Amino acid sequence: MAGIQDLKGKTAVVTGGGSGIGKGMCRRFAHQGMNVVVADIEGEAAEKVAIALRTEGARAIALACDVSQRSDIESLAAASIDEFGAVDVACNNAGIFFGGKLREFTEGDWEWTMSVNLMGVVHGSTIFGKHMAERGSGQIVNTASIGGWAPDPNCAPYTTSKFAVVGFSEALRRDLEPDGVGVTILCPGPVATGMAKADRLRPASAGSSNATSLAAEPVMAVGMPPDDVGDLVIDGIRENATYVFTHPDFGAAFEPRFDEMRRALARTPKPRTGDVRPEDLS
């Protein structure tokens, strides 16, 4: 299935659009002549981005949105469609990160991470996916991570959420392809963003934490420019690419995992079939 070749006049919704990778995508989409909906839990940040885009001549609106709340995504979709008539590209990009030893993470850390990084993607994909399937076209871009393929130490909740985003998005791609809707999985490496400062957004329901979000700050500070990620995403949309990676050198980090899988498969005997006992099926 081909991707969306001509983006001019199309509409993109970007969660986490007030900063970082989301902001970079918003800017690059606007430069392509797209209408842009900048969605962010920090409404003021989203508005600043939208104002800057409008100053450059783009059609852009800002909407406050907590992606962990399905009702917020439903409202986001409704407002976007009311404003621009349809949504052609939905980027489920909002995410949080903090690091620490496994024993340091609280139940609140896990629940908050999953509610944003995974369920935010699920909410956006199912709501915008339904809209696109009914129209017979569209592209969903879900932000995972290099960490969704090659886990780093000291960030178990984040890694778990991003592995889940990869698996969910691969399944979603197969589900939506017959409806003419593409799904692309964005897997960034280090990008110059403020995601490592997620603690400022921590809800009261998540309680206090012994972990810290500051561990990744030095890496983020020397990361790839967010606008460059936006350009790669546009290429991925046009190709209906399954994956978009930002750092090709990181491919070497995948090999130990793949090697372990190949060794495990090679030493595994073929399963027996037949000889099924009725009690095995009870």
Which residues fall in each region the model found?
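Canonical Rossmann dinucleotide-binding motif of NAD(H)/NADP(H)-dependent dehydrogenases/reductases
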Residues: A2-V37
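The beta1-alpha1 cofactor-binding region of Rossmann-like NAD(H)/NADP(H)-dependent oxidoreductases
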Residues: G43-E44, L63-S75, E107
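Substrate-binding pocket helix/loop in short-chain dehydrogenase/reductase
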Residues: K101-L102, T106-E111
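Active-site loop immediately N-terminal to the catalytic Tyr-X3-Lys motif
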Residues: R103, A150-A156
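Active-site helix of classical SDR
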Residues: S125, S161
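Residue(s) in the substrate-gating loop at a strand-loop-helix junction
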Residues: S145
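SDR active-site lid
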Residues: P178-P248
